[in-house]
């Protein structure tokens, strides 16, 4: 690979950051905002919302692998299909937050999320698969270099999306309308910036699902991704409830969310530098340990402890930065070795990553309701608040420990 060509590919990396920001804005922030929005605005029960989210993720059991296979077969039509998916996701987000439900709120919630999640799946699979092709042309540590741009953009996208409705609240009467419109504009801009990149993946032969699933390292990395992503899914789903009810600090949700995601975003280049010196696996194990310690403290916080929790947000946010950068880079590197087209591999990766969010929704939200917890109430019992603390902090600790053990016994390259 000539140095001039490598330099050209480096100049295209900002497009990956912007596109990742758009995708991430439709990921975790939806789980942060949508359940609470539909509870507060339309009175939908937590258990019902959790059930809908779980059913949608079960749909992904079939959808994501099939979308991966479809992507591998699109050929020259891929650019057009990706453009359509960007438009569909923008329309779904507008329908979710900026349009009054045309049917019952629960049904509308499910329909709009189906549009958002389906487009999200298709775009994510193609985006990460394209990253394998691009990273292979960037020389040594190419996967880490691309991951820094991609995940930094993703985390800044999460930061903006997480606090945007809270910020818009000070300027407009319908903050979620502003959020949805802003997302739609970002989707169009990001799709335009990445348009030239999609052609690079043409002509690569698909290796199929069997190649990915029969590879012991790829299989183990998928399992680790599932277990390691679950703590993020759990804490993201319960974050607003934890700050509002357990810490009794209404109004601090926005600043604490921003602190958490900014810490993650600014940690990405630092983790990348450490990984180049210590190795990717060793660095990821360090970050997992940091997350375990941080969530361990959060179990014991109570009313008014928002300042101590801010420290936890910094530490756990930094750990998230490593999770989102290093683990996908490890998987992408493996896909480059066994399945260069990578679409089926990232179809499986997308399913695994999102199924953890379904796990959190279907188990945690109903569990909170059964414990007697009520969102926005000042009279939640000590038992329900204790259950909230256990679900928010103790469950992620246990899952992270399991992921750390799995990674320790996985033979992967440190590059």
Show which residues each predicted segment covers.
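Membrane-embedded alpha-helical bundles of multi-pass transporters/translocases
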Residues: 2-415
